Amino acid sequence: MKVDLRKIRCRCCAALVFLAGSFSASHAGPPFVTDDPEPVELGHWEVYGFGAGTQVKGDIGGTLVGTEVNYGAAPNLQLHVIVPLAYDSPSGGPFVAGPGDIELGAKYRFVTPGEDDWYPQVGIFPLIEVPAGNAARGLGAGKMRAYMTVWLQKDWGDWTSYGGGGYWINPGPGNQNYWFVGWLLQNQVTKQLALGAEIFHQTADMIGGKDKTSFNVGGIYDFNENYHLLFSGGRGLQNPALTNQFSYYLAIQWTH
């Protein structure tokens, strides 16, 4: 039987770009990859319409368009869902798009300091990814995945700093479980504009794969009390050709 090496390379690139690009779209405190422990307030909503992606050598993919919904279901408890339309565009291969993996989670803050307290907010944010995307086309992982995280945040004046990390359960042929850690610093530059920068590190998610360290810069612009623009962009600092030559996130957020 003749082996089509081009197809094998395309499938490997698709797997790499899916796992790299998945962080651009989810597991994060938009518009960044690093998350925070602060849940949506009780009875309030956050709804995002977003696009995100990551380019690696020979491929680019991510979320063509997606919807993220967060709801404050109880004091200090946020329920979370992301439903994406994923895409993958390998060099020398066809552009494909379709349903991506669905993300479900719940954020719970268990340490809530007062304004004058020295210690940070602390919360957990367990997530699962339901394999709704077609893994053979580079649109999903093909297996149920789970992510357990701990996040911390401290505010002072116009500055906010948050970070933490967690552990991914990542089953499937050629895959392995992996760690993520990240930290962010953000400043409220004007009443309407906040700018920030983050750095994050992830161990290899595939057997024989490469660790990655990347950064993003971005911001949030408030049009008014209910509508907001979120944006970020960045690239890898470690093994960028295989992990992150360029990544982006752009969203319109509605809050109520």
Across the structure, where does each feature detected by a protein language model lie?
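Bacterial N-terminal signal peptides
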Residues: R11-S22
